[in-house]
A protein has these predicted regions:
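Flexible cytoplasmic inter-helical loops of multi-pass small-molecule transporters
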Residues: 2-13, 212-235, 448-452
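Hydrophobic core of transmembrane alpha-helices in multi-pass small-molecule transporters
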Residues: 118-136, 347-362
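A membrane-interface helix-boundary motif in multi-pass transporters
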Residues: 179-201, 406-434
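C-terminal ends and interior cores of transmembrane alpha-helices
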Residues: 99-116, 330-344
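C-terminal membrane-cytosol helix-exit motif in multi-pass small-molecule transporters
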Residues: 201-220, 437-444
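Helix-to-loop junctions at the C-terminal end of transmembrane segments
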Residues: 77-89, 179, 308-320, 406
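Helix-loop boundary and gating motifs at the non-cytosolic
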Residues: 13-73, 242-297
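C-terminal transmembrane helical hairpin of 12-TM major facilitator-type secondary transporters
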Residues: 322-364
């Protein structure tokens, strides 16, 4: 990291966003550009994976298993990714992770051509595509922590999150445009999604090249050599006390979200079957398939996130991190029950719900600041990785549980049906669990001292 002077409050001001990128260190700018590229790929693809699997002939149980495998990856990747980053530096770590993710997008692209191996290939692509997002988590946290003073961490994360969420706004709109000429049949969904994956591969190559060529590793802070499982156990035992109530609440909220998150696209496209028919005088009648409209909804969600993220991060400097994080938890918790009970075919109601859902992202910079803030310099990657390891290990079965509640299940010994399956029940239970987590954090969550 190139550092000529110690970072100041001005350097961490996210309101200077697109002028020398929030006036932060060059490394945060480079990280944000890479985040923009990869987030385009992730947002165009990951939110549609359940629809892709349905189009390839699977159902809710396989989709749930896919979600839980993703949770396994999220649990296992961040800690070694953070340790690798602390050991070899962020530049080389993120380059390797970026290449792996790009290959993963390519595997998804060719999966439909593999016949009976199509679904296994989708699972293989998942292990690869998540490398930058999950392996690189500790590295990205460490870069921001090195460049931003403790009292400005939320603003620093708001800077990177704003570029990342800008990609999350653009990505779904690209997906919506690519779905637009196609119908809602499975063959059309597969072809349109392959075009989306091709775009993701291109952005993956660009993002990897940008972070490798532009990032200055000169000021990377290196931790000690990774000592294996013993170090992992020590890191878990030595998690700062401030993180423990946050970890409990975050785990409950994420478990709830994990039960249903992968099914959001299926709710819109197949359960509600809601597209958009709009009479536009300038261009004539506009008709979007449910798949295309889902991309518009994701774009709307991200637009709200972008409009609120920076002001909320600044507000956190006045009111503290805890209220902001609690707000995000509440929106996470209540959204599933609202979505599953939306009236079928009502595009306006879905638009309002996804706009509301965008508020959950407003608390993410504060949430990340609350995680990484107490960490010692040189260990930010490991602390972040250890935190996410614990959370994501517990969250692993959530998507599979959601799939079983959606599709139903039988007694494996007798074949007798135990539960017929009900998407509304699955989403209702998810909301209940999320509200428990939100309440726990409201009661026991602690504030980071730099914000008191």
């Amino acid at each position: 990291m190139s550092v000529e002077e110690g970072p100041t409050a001005e350097e961490a001001d996210p309101l200077d966003a697109f002028r020398q990128f929030f006036a932060l260190e060059r490394d945060v700018l480079v990280l944000s550009l890479a985040m923009f590229a990869f987030s385009l790929g992730f947002q165009m693809t990951s939110r549609y994976m359940a629809e892709y699997l349905y189009a390839l002939g699977t159902g809710a149980v396989i989709v749930g298993v896919f979600g839980s495998v993703g949770n396994v990856i999220s649990a296992l990747y961040p800690y070694p990714g953070g340790a690798i980053s602390d050991r070899i530096g962020s530049r080389y770590a993120l380059t390797v992770f970026g290449l792996l993710s790009t290959v993963g997008f390519a595997v998804w692209l060719v999966a439909p051509w593999l016949g009976p191996l199509a679904v296994p290939a989708v699972f293989l692509g998942l292990f690869l595509s998540q490398a930058w997002k999950s392996f690189g988590l500790g590295a990205s946290f460490a870069i921001v922590k090195q460049a931003v003073p403790p009292s400005q961490l939320a603003a620093g994360f708001a800077s990177t999150e704003t570029f990342r969420r800008t990609a999350f706004l653009v990505g779904p709109l690209i997906a919506a445009a690519l779905f637009y000429p196609f119908g809602s049949g499975d063959a059309d969904v597969v072809l349109a999604f392959q075009l989306i994956l091709l775009v993701a591969v291109v952005f993956g190559v660009l993002g990897t090249a940008a972070q490798h060529l532009l990032y200055d590793p000169g000021g990377d802070s290196f931790g000690t050599e990774f000592e294996g499982v013993s170090q992992l156990v020590a890191d878990l035992r030595n998690l700062p006390a401030e993180l423990r109530p946050l970890l409990v609440a975050d785990t409950l909220v994420r478990f709830a979200n994990g039960m249903v998150y992968v099914f959001f696209v299926v709710v819109v496209t197949r359960f509600l079957g809601t597209g958009l028919d709009l009479a536009a005088p300038a261009v004539g009648d506009l008709s979007l398939s449910p798949q295309s409209y889902f991309g518009v909804l994701l774009g709307l969600e991200m637009l709200v996130a972008l409009l609120t993220m920076v002001p909320v991060a600044k507000a956190a400097e006045r009111v503290g991190l805890k209220p902001v994080v609690a707000l995000g938890f509440f929106v996470y918790a209540i959204f599933p029950i609202l979505l599953i009970n939306a009236p079928p075919g009502d595009a306006a109601v879905l638009a309002a719900l996804f706009a509301f859902s965008g508020l959950r992202f407003a608390g993410l910079p504060a949430h990340k600041a609350l995680i990484v803030g107490p960490a010692e310099t040189g260990a930010g990657g490991r602390v972040t990785g250890a935190y996410y390891l614990v959370r994501n290990l517990i969250v692993i079965p959530s998507a599979a549980l959601g799939g079983l509640l959606w599709a139903g299940f039988s007694n494996p010994l007798t074949g007798e049906e135990v539960f017929a399956g009900d998407p509304t029940v699955a989403f209702g239970i998810a909301t209940a669990v999320g509200l428990v987590g939100t309440g726990y954090f409201a009661l026991f969550g602690e504030e980071f001292e730099a914000y008191t």
